[in-house]
UniProtKB/Swiss-Prot annotation:
Residues 1-5 form a propeptide. This is Type II secretion system protein I. It is found in: Cell inner membrane. The gene is outI. The modification N-methylmethionine is found at M6. It comes from the Bacteria. It is a single-pass membrane protein. InterPro entries: N_methyl_site (IPR012902), Pilin-like (IPR045584), T2SS_GspI_C (IPR003413), T2SS_protein-GspI (IPR010052). Type II secretion is composed of four main components: the outer membrane complex, the inner membrane complex, the cytoplasmic secretion ATPase and the periplasm-spanning pseudopilus. Interacts with core component OutG. Component of the type II secretion system required for the energy-dependent secretion of extracellular factors such as proteases and toxins from the periplasm. Part of the pseudopilus tip complex that is critical for the recognition and binding of secretion substrates. The chain crosses the membrane at residues 6-26. GO terms for biological process: protein secretion by the type II secretion system. Cleaved by prepilin peptidase.
């Protein structure tokens, strides 16, 4: 007699294989969603850092050598930034370091950005 269909064991093995494949797809999707959230957070932090540096340039502020901190409401969240001026070999030029954190107490910054500023009123050579 010829067998038609699948045995119960074959059906159960097939179900296990499909279940494992489904879990793998679900896990990958969850990781991608988490990664997108982190990417969005890092992008916002970089925008805030760029905004702080642009504000210093527009206001023609000379960056202080100690950390100056503040906070800003951005994209519906409270963010914490701090800026420090760092001396360079040329006394008319300072490096500006900006760190941005979503959590004030976080040891690691969400974004760190460095740029350089020529002292206001001094011609660059």
């Amino acid at each position: 007699m010829k067998q038609q269909g699948m045995t119960l064991l074959e059906v159960m093995v097939a179900l296990v294989i499909f279940a494992l494949a489904g879990l793998t797809v679900l896990k990958t999707t969850a990781q991608q969603a988490n990664g997108l959230g982190r990417l969005e957070e890092k992008t916002f932090a970089l925008w805030i850092a760029e905004n702080q540096q642009a504000a210093m340039r527009l206001e023609k502020q000379w960056p202080q050598s100690q950390w100056v901190d503040g906070e800003v409401n951005f994209a519906g969240s409270l963010w914490f930034w701090r800026i420090q001026g760092i001396a360079t070999a040329d006394t008319r030029v300072r490096a500006i370091d900006v760190e941005v954190r979503h959590d004030r107490d976080s040891r690691a910054a969400d974004a760190v950005l460095r740029s350089y500023l020529v002292q206001p009123g001094e011609p660059a050579q």
